[in-house]
Swiss-Prot record:
Primary localisation category: cytoplasm
Cofactor(s) demanded: Mg(2+)
Entry-linked Gene3D superfamilies: GHMP Kinase, N-terminal domain, K Homology domain, type 1, Nucleic acid-binding proteins
Location of the KH domain: 560-619
GO molecular function, one term: magnesium ion binding
Source species of the chain: Paraburkholderia phytofirmans (strain DSM 17436 / LMG 22146 / PsJN)
Protein name according to UniProt: Polyribonucleotide nucleotidyltransferase
Amino acid sequence: MTMFNKIVKEFQWGQHKVRLETGEIARQASGAVIVDVEDTVVLATVVGAKTAKPGQDFFPLTVDYLEKTYAAGKIPGGFFRREGRPSEGETLISRLIDRPLRPLFPEGFYNEVQVVIHVLSLNPEIPADIPALIGASAALAVSGLPFNGPVGAARVAYINNEYVLNPTRPQMKESALDLIVAGTERAVLMVESEAQQLSEEVMLGGVVFGHEQMQIAIDAIHDLVREGGKPEWDWQPAAKNEPLIARVTELAQADLLAAYQLRDKQARSAKLKEVYAATSKKLEEDAAAGGTVAADKATVGNVLFDIEAKIVRTQILNGEPRIDGRDTRTVRPIEIRTGVLPRTHGSALFTRGETQAMVVATLGTKGDEQNIDALEGEYRERFMLHYNMPPFATGETGRVGSPKRREIGHGRLAKRALAACLPSADEFGYSIRVVSEITESNGSSSMASVCGGCLALMDAGVPMKAHVAGIAMGLILEGNKFAVLTDILGDEDHLGDMDFKVAGTEQGVTALQMDIKIQGITKEIMQVALAQAKEGRMHILSKMTSAVSGANTVLSDYAPRMITIKINPEKIRDVIGKGGSVIRALTEETGTTIDISDDGVVTIASTSSEGMAEAKKRIENITLEVEVGQVYEGTVLKLLDFGAIVNILPGKDGLLHISEIANERIKDINDYLKDGQQVKVKVIQTDEKGRVRLSAKALLNEGANGASGAPQGEPTPQ
């Protein structure tokens, strides 16, 4: 008899067999599920605190996705030989899992919940992100926590005009789309994607296809819960304090309405702070007069937020102007300036309303590419995009330092949007880094980074295939009434039911990200939203094209220039030299950066054209092949009794035998040659070991016959 109550569910999912199991591993967690997809195995665990901390006014959910190197049969690098802080990839997948789970916890549930997913085994062809998301959903479902799931997820590719479910990594190389969709049985909750300029119809079709195909995973989780689920928690939301709600509404509603008539963000924020403070103070006075305890500020703040949301949502659904006075379809005023920083390779200042990004592009060589030591294998990243948003961007003080999860996520979204329109490495051999510094923020800063990033790249001379613009959209839904908002503000993001970001060109979409906070948003609503987003994107693209028609044809004076030459791959070791001595001397003496690929392509980069020319000349000399019948100007290196060693090319010596020096018999070689003497010689033979035989006599004879190219200054008796 076993000590485990192990429950296993298996199902065929597209081209993969999936196995879910619970009851054997991590039994002390609130919920734990193993997911196995063709040897990619993840362990997802959930622990929920039984009570909320006193005064807690938000839901403390943390999701950590962790890759273990043993999963791929590797030992970690570094001094300690163990895993360190999460990589960028792990952070992005943690966010990917968090986003569809968070809205499914009930309002008012403030108990701490921690979701931890470990990758235990990795099939390099099967990415672990979808199994991890399925596992996290299943672990929450079996835990009994108050969770309105389960959630399913799927990856969708678009290959040869057909959707493909959960493609392998090799298949993804052929795909024009990489789309991840997560949702419940009834609704889509999250979309994350990048595409090769696809139409809105194809993108929406991928979302619908993924939602349909994930249902089998949701059904399997239901089966797992029926047999292995723990009892549901007896949790009930706190009863609404109707007297408090009525009193706060009485005290604050008129002032909140007045605050939302202020179009300027700073003035509006200041007014809202005044209303919050005045309301709390008045409630404290009421409590003191009545001999009771006043409601805590968190509770009062939640009531005020609900009133704010109702005001803004009602105004918009009734067709009244938005917070800043716009209608639902208008994009905020746009200002564009390029070349703003004198010593950078490319720069742009993109301002849209109260959101502003200063974006800088830097060009580098192959040696500047980022080495990624991923679980599935090492690779190099030629294009990097980093997003930073310091606290001053919103007029606040706060922590400054390493990027937070949000900054990493926004940077990746902007990178995905631009990647489809970058030239290939063959077309433009530079590595590229784009940094977006958000200097003002009031909504849609990641999309400002896309617009500014495209402009900075063009300013740097990167031949982009097309202009790329991005726009953030919002949606408010009440019953049968809904409104789609173009170019949302920060406040509209918080108060709406869906926010989604669309980036692309005139031809199509390159990136799409959706986060849906409620159930009930239909395909038809998403269709309307995408069509309105396209309208906004086209408006921004027209502004960008007017400001910058195309990429600069001349690089910055401070950007490196590059030339490439092809050498025999067998000569690579000669250019590198023993311990790197030759290439090190080359780079130091010519002031260049030299990269050599395995196929013999040598890339020379420098801000000095003279240095590049010198480096090229030296490399060509080093790699010249000795050809039989060719005449060389050589230098005598060493005299021997039977001949001389003559250097004819850098690193290439040959034997000039005593019988090949002159037509007459030579008794003493010193009568004809001396160390360091310049001598013209002809290559008469090479062998498989690379040994070279030379002749000066052959040139004397050619000269005697009147042949062209007769040697000059041939060796003569001393």
